[in-house]
Amino acid sequence: MNIIKTDIEGVLIIEPRLFRDARGYFFESFSEREFEEKVAPILGHSVHFCQDNESMSSYGVMRGLHFQRPPYTQSKLVRCVKGRVLDVAVDIRKGSPTYGRHVAVELTEDNHRQFFIPKGFAHGFAVLSETAVFQYKCDNFYHPEADGGISILDETLGIDWKIPTEHANLSEKDTKHAMLKDFDSPFDINVNLYK
């Protein structure tokens, strides 16, 4: 496992170790032991995943930018098992020196990269291939009453989604999220969300 730190503390890119031969490849997509040994020390705390989700989407689908409000906050470990997506984490912690900044990473069926998004971040992705199968590991269960989001189309975030606007396909719910400037974040950099 290779861990790549990004420009925002706690947001990580994880590259699994692949074993290839004439038959194809094999890799461990997740090992709790290895995550605890290698990732937890970087984060400064443990993360215990309890729910796995999978979505299938077609080209131009954009999902996000989502989060769950306290006390049901979620960290996510995501990957693309089929196709290609641009995955994004946006820091929405009040008082954070990186508030409003984002990290974007391309996740594909070929690079096998995984992306760790901590609590206090909004998360979203755009499908860049004909179809994509996307998997999420979450460290808290889904609570619809705690659902939140900011607009995935907010140009002030400076995200290049690599999709022409006319091809963007959003759910009705995702078209109604507030822009960052109108958003009152439930997260604060001084509150430890992992206690």
Region roles according to the model:
Residues 107-131:
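Conserved metal-binding segment of the jelly-roll/cupin
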